[in-house]
Amino acid sequence: MADPSSYRPAPGTIPTQPGVYRFSDAHGQVIYVGKAKNLRNRLNSYFQDISALHPRTQRMVTTAAHVQWTVVQNEVESLQLEYTWIKEFDPRFNVMYRDDKSYPWLCFTWTDEYPRVFVGRGAHHKGWRYYGPFGQAWAIRDTVETLLRVFPMRSCSTGVFNRAKNQGRPCLLGYIGKCSAPCVERITSEAHREIADEFCDFMAGRTTKIVKRLESQMAEASENLEFERAAVIRDSLGALSKTLERNAVVLGDGTDADVISMALDPLEVGVKIFHVRGGRIRGERGWVADRADDADEAELMETFLTQLYGVNASDGQVRDDGHGNAVPPLVLVSAEPTNPDVMSTILSSERGSHVEIRVPRRGDKATLMDTVTRNAQETLAQHKLKRASDLATRTRALEEIQESLGLDRAPLRMESYDISHIQGTNVVGSMVVFEDGMPRKSEYRRFSIKGFEGSDDFAAMHEVLSRRLRRLIEDRDAMAAAQTPDGDVGSLIDPTTGSPRKFAYAPHLIVVDGGAPQVHAAQQVLEEFGLEDEIALCGLAKRLEEVWLPDEEWPVILPRTSEGLYLLQRLRDEAHRFAITFHRSKRSKAMVESVLDGVSGLGETRRKALVSHFGSVRSLRKATVDDIVEVPGFGPKLAGEVVAALSQDKPAEAINTATGEVVDANGPDAGR
């Protein structure tokens, strides 16, 4: 590893203008490319205290041996040059969004004399037209089968086409009306290309013109008493209607747009894009990438747009609108890129006309963005599930944790704890269990903190761990007392409850959320019960994802792509999620009781019915008298008193103790 100071540029030699820089290793291989408004400020940040850098950035600057830069005139040029260098050098420390190459596309071999339509995957060919990608291959194949009745163009392979041509006899599709049989010259090359062009128009969303033309032809055939021809056209219209029904209108104004959303976690980012043409979803696609540093969603979005409409567009990987334009006139995003005007200028240049980039705030575009966001979250969740459920991956993760933390065995049972509250009220704790790298949800536990009042995370964690470890000791003692004279161990079933003694199993590793202070507090509890030599302990700090051990001055830094770190993060995040869920439930119940104390005739049963029906105080506040009357046990008079009580009680501000953010105490995100 190189010392960054060994290749640091001399003071004053770095310009203050905007530009693009690149780090290279000792072999001259470019390993990172970046851009900056002020090159001096940005590059100097890499040569400060290395411990303050992001772990991945630390590895980059210690791997590098040289740094070079190029000054440009403005941010547009810097973004373009950055993209060019990333494409040319493929630097391994840059975030690269790579998608599943198995996505199916609808392909038109436009460079052939008689273009062919087929469903394909993999690399794209220059000059061909592509539509998609699509989520399911069977769905687009079914659509093609239907549309070939309306647009009878060639769909056979080159071998089949040449064989039919040599034999002078078309294949079956030519006989059943699903191909115009250009192989036997039933149709000219120009006429066949017109059919293919109409097929492309339909896939691009320009359906109105085609439907009107067919309706006009059907009416004309009927007037001329050509009923057989009219019936064929009627069937074609039915096929089009069937296809359009499968692909409902999502944007009523017939917009051409790409709708892009991101789902983030500390280690990875999931991206989903819906290609909307003519107001209908014509394709979708998903990506997952490792987060290389602490870049926020705006920076990640800028990187993604650059790669999507730069690298992918040049390779034919972005949906064409039928006119050779990979970039639509409107790009809807879940977060604006860092430099939206600059990005808009670049995309406008790529398209040849103005491209608008914006975040939808209301209407059908905002509704569609919500759908794309849910799909992005699902893309990331499915990726994480696939990664976590693989046996070889889980085994490697446990081995990495064992080696990195210096454990004498793999931590087959791990437990993680978290505390949740708002301003010291409704303090709760959670315990989640992973066995063999997978959640064991039947052994999750929730704790209502009873030993103190107020906001003291350390005292709350002390109580939670003490209660858990006390049960461990008690269950062990009970098992020892039940040991038979012949040496058989006591039953793992509690004779008083008939339930398994689940607390009798000691964890191999306890994971707490936090750094050195949180680990020290948890270690004190282990020492109080004499379990510090039996149960290993670590803390996982947010942001830098450092692993802290008891009595260690420095944290353990696991590689960013480590399966061990990924497993520890999942365990910690699951404890956080479980604690917040319990806190919200408890807080909602307490708020209902507090707000409705003065309403006569409203007992515990009816309060529970309100909470069950509306789900939260926030939803209950929005309810009208008519809404509340629908709840069993509530008449108009009682419902009116509830509405009056809620209108007098205004929600107070609350502080999220994890972030310091002011939140709505009744909101869905309140709680820590």
From Swiss-Prot:
Origin: domain of life: Bacteria
Subcellular location: Cytoplasm
Keywords, in A-Z order: Cytoplasm, DNA damage, DNA excision, DNA repair, Excision nuclease, SOS response
InterPro entries: GIY-YIG_endonuc (IPR000305), GIY-YIG_endonuc_sf (IPR035901), GIY-YIG_UvrC_Cho (IPR047296), Hlx-hairpin-Hlx_DNA-bd_motif (IPR003583), RuvA_2-like (IPR010994), UVR_dom (IPR001943), UVR_dom_sf (IPR036876), UvrABC_protein_C (IPR050066)
Coiled-coil segments: none
Domain UVR intervals: 208-243
UniProt-recorded Gene Ontology molecular function terms: DNA binding; excinuclease ABC activity
Disulfide bonds: none
Residue ranges of every copy of the GIY-YIG domain listed in the record: 16-95
GO BP terms: nucleotide-excision repair; SOS response
Function: The UvrABC repair system catalyzes the recognition and processing of DNA lesions. UvrC both incises the 5' and 3' sides of the lesion. The N-terminal half is responsible for the 3' incision and the C-terminal half is responsible for the 5' incision.
Family recorded in the similarity comment: Belongs to the UvrC family.
Subunit relationships: Interacts with UvrB in an incision complex.
Name this protein carries in UniProt: UvrABC system protein C
Source organism per UniProt: Cutibacterium acnes (strain DSM 16379 / KPA171202)
Encoding gene, per UniProt annotation: uvrC
